Amino acid sequence: MATKSSTSQAVSKLRQPIVCVLGHVDHGKTTLLDLIRGTSVASKEPGGITQRIAATTVDISRILKETEKLNTKGLKIPGLLFIDTPGHVAFSNMRARGGALADLAILVIDINEGIMPQTVESIDILKKFKTPFIIAANKIDLIPFFTDVKTNLFTEFIRKQRQEYVNELDNRIYSIMNKLYEFGLNSDRFDRISDFTKTIAIVPVSAKKNIGVPEILMVLAGLAQRFLEREIEYRDINGHATIIEVRKEESAGITLDAVLYQGTISVGDSIAVNTKNGPAVTKVKALFVNTGKGQRALKEVKKVSAAEGIRVLISDKIDVISGSPMIVVRDNLDQVMKEIEEESKVDIPLSEEGIYVKAEAIGSLEAISYELNKQGIKIKQAQVGDITKRDIMDVSTLPDPINRIIVGFNVSVLPEARDAMSSSDVSIVTGDIIYKIVEDTQKVMDERKKMLLQGRKMSMPVPSRIRILPQYIFRASKPVIVGVRVETGQIKVGDNLIRGDGKYAGTIKSIRNEDVSVRYQDAPAEVAVAIDNVTLNRQIFPDDVLYVDITENVVKELRRAPMEKEIMDTLEEIIRIKRKDNPFWGTRV
């Protein structure tokens, strides 16, 4: 495990380490998180919209109770604070002073499926933020030879399994270890590790059967206390928090769900936040925390200390940006406003030409932009917020039609934007899974390139080569009708043809592909063509190779904006043919 830092220095007071859960879709993130939350939430009220703040504390008394058979009596941390929203997008959105809000992470991997696309995205993000993490190898109950055992401890469970099951489990763990090694990560099963600073712990679990959660809590708590004491040392300073969600309550006003990761916050405090119009200051009208007594249970308080999930009712109606910082202002307004501005900067490389990207928060904007850039997709503009009519209007005027695309990640397309789309050629790609959005964006770009290329091909003669098939001679004159193989490019009705010596070889009158008459035909294909103004065995012959005739203007256009390699190679063949009569043909363009 790569830690942020390590220290043996004794610390007088520690705050709760903050934990985020990541992993591929359907690998069990939410189920595992619910199971962990179940160790701290006494009861859950069915139905209705949850009124809980999206962060759950598992206090030290519960951790000690869950892990009492695992020798964890020396723990000094007050508990673990789990971010309730799983996924690498949530992780990316939760920042703290330029780094990740989470002190630790759980990467959930389906032990039977192994590492998948979103697993890779999660690993990339964890490495980027240098966040220590453990692996929950989930769904061990689906491994062959599984025997159900009445225990929630993996260490007890594994001792009661058949050897065939143990072998199957080890094979799957070794497979994950080998794959992780390709990413430069050393890993092993948690109970086989001697140095946790160098090796990532893999904890086999079954979220469905409630196996392995005590070991998850034990490893997380132990790692935090042993290697992250400096990071989780409590400091009595003005409060620093990260906003998870912005809510507009009709009766109350605007509330901010946030994770307070350092210092304190009180009712009446002035707080600085980032809005769509830049940094702003507002006041705390009320503070709420979870009570731990159910999904709908909130408790109003006057003051909160880190680390804790909080709900803040603010005094002003301002457009606060989710994922942005929230800092308590004492006598340091200028410094805090500068800090808000710095932490809210978007770190995305932009290009003179490219697509537009919109996302719900700064972190997700950076996450989707990073993946798009990795695939060579250039970005001209990246902003937080829903897709608006102004976005449609701006993108519709981009000079390159291929870039007239707006990618929306976890955002809505406003009604006025949908109306504007009907009269524009702008494409919108939206979704909530990064790798799927990237795939869809690439498909849209490829389709746009194809359509643009087809439009160009239809507007001018395309350098093409065809070969007459001697076994398919249907008529010798008026017009010649023969079967041909289109070897490169695209032939069209009306194209003039030349021979290999540059002499005129007729004009294409019609094209038939099987029993269908077509206006054009792309290579490779075999079709029948009718050729006007020539006679077979006089101007053209069976086995002849013919070319579509082009002008010097076509050479100029293709050198400015090339087509496929086969077409460009055929262009060079035609230039060589033309230069037999005119050595300077195609040079004055």
Swiss-Prot record:
Residues 138-141 are annotated as: G4. Keywords: GTP-binding, Initiation factor, Nucleotide-binding, Protein biosynthesis. Pfam families: GTP_EFTU, GTP_EFTU_D4, IF-2. Coiled coil: none annotated. CDD domains: aeIF5B_II, IF2_aeIF5B_IV, IF2_eIF5B. Transmembrane segments: none annotated. Residues 206-208 are annotated as: G5. GO terms for cellular component: cytoplasm. HAMAP family: IF_2_A. This is Probable translation initiation factor IF-2. It comes from Thermoplasma acidophilum (strain ATCC 25905 / DSM 1728 / JCM 9062 / NBRC 15155 / AMRC-C165). The lineage of its organism: Archaea, Methanobacteriati, Thermoplasmatota, Thermoplasmata, Thermoplasmatales.
